[in-house]
């Protein structure tokens, strides 16, 4: 036939280095077929050939889910080719561009609590004192360590939030005060909405109650019908404009609205008196007259630059002044109580009962009002036999 191959073998392309993209021919097990390991070792010793680095790394599951067939001599003698399921470590990711260009990686900064423990104190004063340190200030203002430089770091969300809701170094907001401050307006808004929805039904209900006082057997038909303006049968509380009883219904509802406005005015006076907005001089003991004006013996004048006078003065004929300070709260209520007690001595017996009522919480008062609103008429009919016992109970209450 001929002599063995003495020249460089060419096959699988002009290049002697045959790539191995599919991972076949690991460890050159098929080289003896081409006599590459015997008489023509040029295949293994070709410096330009691919060394096939991935040939020996047959991934687990490359020939099926979780299985590598033990093909032995065909695929090589690696543990993967022998059917041993071993996981080879993955190659590290390639280096980034900036590291190839010579830039060194940024070292990990130590924790702030280790380098500057004084900056970790939850105290605004100590925190601002720590900012005086240039090293600590450089952490927050990298551009020169000053907030007045042209190059400032981008503000964070936390800094924006703190700058909106509070000043730098200011005290933390008290959530209890915020909640209590919002609860009052919400309750008032709820009451206003309730009154707006009931603005027509409340006068009508009161009108029905007022009219029912004249008709114990129930509300009859409206007696205001005549032949000139015939109307259908209706109640006296819902007269149409063509009915002669319409003007009386309007008069009753107008009086009801006046009483509602009077109740609102009383509620406003009570609120202002509780907040100390009504500086009423109390009655001076032993005198029935009070007056406000400059006092010779008072440290603070009754008529001064302040919004409200701080003391009340009684001016007898001799010119001497008796000064009594105005209460900071319930000034009008105390004045009315002293005025009524001076004229009706039996009211002094109710002092303990009034003090007990004042000591009740608003929740108890709201519960009592709600019970009277719904169960009041029924309770009146049930408790009517016991009404004569009420004075005896009050006397025993005061005496004990």
UniProtKB/Swiss-Prot annotation:
The gene is S. The large envelope protein exists in two topological conformations, one which is termed 'external' or Le-HBsAg and the other 'internal' or Li-HBsAg. In its external conformation the protein attaches the virus to cell receptors and thereby initiating infection. This interaction determines the species specificity and liver tropism. This attachment induces virion internalization predominantly through caveolin-mediated endocytosis. The large envelope protein also assures fusion between virion membrane and endosomal membrane. The middle envelope protein plays an important role in the budding of the virion. It is involved in the induction of budding in a nucleocapsid independent way. In this process the majority of envelope proteins bud to form subviral lipoprotein particles of 22 nm of diameter that do not contain a nucleocapsid. Residues 2-174 are annotated as: Pre-S. It is found in: Virion membrane. Residues 84-114 are annotated as: Disordered. It comes from the Viruses. Isoform M is N-terminally acetylated by host at a ratio of 90%, and N-glycosylated by host at the pre-S2 region. GO terms for cellular component: membrane; viral envelope; virion membrane. Residues 120-174 are annotated as: Pre-S2. Glycans are attached at residue 320. Belongs to the orthohepadnavirus major surface antigen family. It comes from Hepatitis B virus genotype F2 (isolate Argentina/sa16/2000) (HBV-F). A lipid is attached at residue 2 (N-myristoyl glycine). Its main location: virion. InterPro entries: HBV_HBSAG. Residues 2-181, 275-348, 399-400 are virion surface. The keyword Acetylation applies. Residues 2-119 are annotated as: Pre-S1. Keywords: Acetylation, Caveolin-mediated endocytosis of virus by host, Fusion of virus membrane with host endosomal membrane, Fusion of virus membrane with host membrane, Glycoprotein, Host-virus interaction, Lipoprotein, Membrane, Myristate, Transmembrane, Transmembrane helix, Viral attachment to host cell, Viral envelope protein, Viral penetration into host cytoplasm, Virion, Virus endocytosis by host, Virus entry into host cell. The chain crosses the membrane at residues 182-202, 254-274, 349-369, 376-398. One of its GO terms (biological process) is fusion of virus membrane with host endosome membrane. This is Large envelope protein. The large envelope protein is synthesized with the pre-S region at the cytosolic side of the endoplasmic reticulum and, hence will be within the virion after budding. Therefore the pre-S region is not N-glycosylated. Later a post-translational translocation of N-terminal pre-S and TM1 domains occur in about 50% of proteins at the virion surface. These molecules change their topology by an unknown mechanism, resulting in exposure of pre-S region at virion surface. Residues 2-253, 203-253, 370-375 are intravirion. Systematic vaccination of individuals at risk of exposure to the virus has been the main method of controlling the morbidity and mortality associated with hepatitis B. The first hepatitis B vaccine was manufactured by the purification and inactivation of HBsAg obtained from the plasma of chronic hepatitis B virus carriers. The vaccine is now produced by recombinant DNA techniques and expression of the S isoform in yeast cells. The pre-S region do not seem to induce strong enough antigenic response.
């Amino acid at each position: 036939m001929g002599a063995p191959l003495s020249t460089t073998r060419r096959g699988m392309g002009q290049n002697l280095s045959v790539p191995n993209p599919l991972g076949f021919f690991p460890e050159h097990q098929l080289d003896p077929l081409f006599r590459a390991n015997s008489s023509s070792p040029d295949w293994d010793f070709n410096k330009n050939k691919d060394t096939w680095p991935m040939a020996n790394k047959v991934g687990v599951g490359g020939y099926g889910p979780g299985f590598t067939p033990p093909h032995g001599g065909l695929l090589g003698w690696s543990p993967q080719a022998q059917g041993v399921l071993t996981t080879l470590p993955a190659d590290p990711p390639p280096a980034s561009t900036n590291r190839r260009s010579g830039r060194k990686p940024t070292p990990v900064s130590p924790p702030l609590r280790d380098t500057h423990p004084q900056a970790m104190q939850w105290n605004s004063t100590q925190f601002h004192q720590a900012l005086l340190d240039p090293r600590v200030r450089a952490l927050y203002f990298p551009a020169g360590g000053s907030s007045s430089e042209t190059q400032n770091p981008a503000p964070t969300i936390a800094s924006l939030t703190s700058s909106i809701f509070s000043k730098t170094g200011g005290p933390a907001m008290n959530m209890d005060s915020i909640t209590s401050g919002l609860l009052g307006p919400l309750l008032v808004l709820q009451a206003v909405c309730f009154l707006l929805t009931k603005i027509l039904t409340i006068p009508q209900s009161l009108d029905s109650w007022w009219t029912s006082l004249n008709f114990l057997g129930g509300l009859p038909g409206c007696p205001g019908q005549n032949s000139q303006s015939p109307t259908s049968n209706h109640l006296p509380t819902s007269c149409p404009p063509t009915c002669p009883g319409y003007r009386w219904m309007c008069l009753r509802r107008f009086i009801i609205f006046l009483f509602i406005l009077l109740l609102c005015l009383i509620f406003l006076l009570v609120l202002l008196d509780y907040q100390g907005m009504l500086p009423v001089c109390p009655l001076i003991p032993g005198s029935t007259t009070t007056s406000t004006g400059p006092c010779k013996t008072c440290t603070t004048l009754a008529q001064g630059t302040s919004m409200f006078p701080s003391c009340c003065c009684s001016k007898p004929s001799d010119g001497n002044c008796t000064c009594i300070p105005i209460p900071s709260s319930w000034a009008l209520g105390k004045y009315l109580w002293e005025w009524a007690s001076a004229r009706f001595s039996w009211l002094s017996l109710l002092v303990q009962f009034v003090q007990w009522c004042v000591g009740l919480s608003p929740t108890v008062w709201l519960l009592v009002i709600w019970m009277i609103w719904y169960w009041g008429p029924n309770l009146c009919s049930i408790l009517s036999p016991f009404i004569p016992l009420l004075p005896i109970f009050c006397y025993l209450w005061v005496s004990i």
